[in-house]
Amino acid sequence: MKKVLTLSMLALCVSHGAAAAQYALDNDSIALSFDDASSTVVVKDTTANHPLTPQELFFLTLPDETKIHTADFTIKHVEKQDNAIVIDFTRPDFNVTVKLNLVKGKYASIDYTIAAVGQPREVAKITFFPTKKQSQAPYVDGAINSSPIIADSFFILPDKPIVNTYAYEATTNLNVELKTPVQPDAPVSFTTYFGTFPETSQLRRSVNQFIDAVRPRAYKPYLHYNSWMDIGFFNPYTEQDVLGRMDEWNKEFITGRGVALDAFLLDDGWDDRTGRWLFGPAFSHGFGKVREKADSLHSSVGLWLSPWGGYNKPRDIRVSHAKEYGFETVDGKLALSGPRYFKNFNEQIIKLIKNEHITSFKLDGMGNANSHITGSQFASDFDASIALLHNMRSANPNLFINLTTGTDASPSWLFYADSIWRQGDDINLYGPGTPVQQWMTYRDAETYRSIVRKGPLFPLNSLMYHGIVSAENAYYGLEKVQTDSDFADQVWSYFATGTQLQELYITPSMLNKVKWDTLAQAAKWARNNASVLVDTHWIGGDPTALEVYGWASWSKDKAILGLRNPSDKPQTYYLDLAKDFEIPTGGMAQFSLNAVYGSNTSVPGEYQKAVVITLQPLETLVYEAIPAK
């Protein structure tokens, strides 16, 4: 990996009388430079020879719409620190530190830290890295707030999903609106990331690889049992209920079929429902016995908590205690950004990490994105959740954190969490076929509507799809025993999505030997093929229109293809693997296709060129593709 830092002193005189200097850094893909005479920064794609020079590094907009520009600050100090250039800007009312960083050998970032001087000061908005006519036709790729900016060969995205991204008529910027004063002793900080892509067909893959490189926990399957719709469904459950399920999973799955189960996640039903997130009567001594058994099975314990208090009657009970404990609420739900509620929630979850050794969290209900609670240090519940997630990672960097309702398809969530919700209902039905087939179509239609179309650069490998469902307290027919073929379709289509959050909402007694075998085989296959499935992306059409759709993932040595026909009629699909696998220019586009699940005579065993295939009604297929020698 190339790391170069140069410092050339320029014999120039600037207003403060010091000699000006130019600083430069580069890695394998990006060069950074800063000229302190003009406060000019250049971020350059060295492969495409394309520079981005902002009009200025930043500017502040005050409540009266007065703007404080970078040029209104004095440069107090500049220095290099390893792979970074640190610039301190000062003026009587604000100090701003800007840090230009090389990241992971091929990316770059700019950190901004803003502090008030002397007293708290109101700032309406901070704008970062505004550019004009630095790229031909920049755009924001996605309808979701903070979706990446694409500027020629660059992608640019914020580290926080509360930051807006903007591109219009060759101008771009990132900006954030502040609802609380900037403090002298508690600066606000934001980061802007820069990456490059070699050609248009590689944009999604390049963003995906960048996210996996910088996220706190790299992609890795997290297979686990979830108690929801099994032993718990808006009802408390007992320690013995949990221990009993663990024995069943061990017998049939862990010891029985040699499948590693990463965790047993206890969903709603464990707490005392006071909103304080304390143990309920059934777990008055904590999770000690559950954890001991999990340890003996080489597994761990995961836990559900809901920042806004949960759902239905349990939520109402928790919220009813809010006044008693001084907890803040918004729209009839507990408010994470409330000072007292945040303090309690944060303290309890850190205790669960440190004292109970909880290894994963399902945080269900992130709250409001826009409402500010008077007296809160946070602009919104979203803002509070970012602080919470940071604190959780500090307590244990290896946590798996799943954020459910309240999030959206901004890739920036993945700088804090491991997965987010696909949107929509937990389970529902759509289209023809049995309830299982209708559930699969609904699951994937919602994913297409809310993620693929609105956030096309969000990695499908980091979605919560609501798992594999075959549980006695499920509904819409999923509480009934499924046919072996329906269950297999559900299982294989689920693992073909490439998601690392692998949830099993399953009542063990509802599975026979064939189903256990199917589940074990598919789970092992997904773990063994994680290095390929990390690239999973959407192919085909819209499940809502009952069009053939699926998932594809590619690496140089192997690729994976999953296809499904959601219609009750046969349908054709134009199989163009160069397009479906998003193969880079010059890459091998001929493959040996091996069926992993299902069989279809219209799919060629030796793929040479694009071909029309026919999928039977409600057919699910999964293939491995090995490049031709």
Where are these regions (language model features)?
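Conserved structural scaffold segments of CAZyme catalytic domains across common CAZy folds
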Residues: 84, 90-93, 104-109, 114-316, ...
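Active-site-proximal substrate-binding groove within the catalytic cores of carbohydrate-active enzymes
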Residues: 185-186, 385-600, 612-625
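The substrate-binding groove and active-site-proximal loops of carbohydrate-active enzymes
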Residues: 224-243, 270-285, 327-344, 367-382, ...
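Active-site-adjacent "subsite" loops/lids of carbohydrate-active enzymes
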Residues: 231-236, 300-356, 367
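Active-site groove signature of glycoside hydrolases
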Residues: 258-270, 345-375
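Aromatic- and acidic-residue-enriched segments that line the glycan-binding/catalytic groove
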Residues: 275-285, 309-330, 414-426
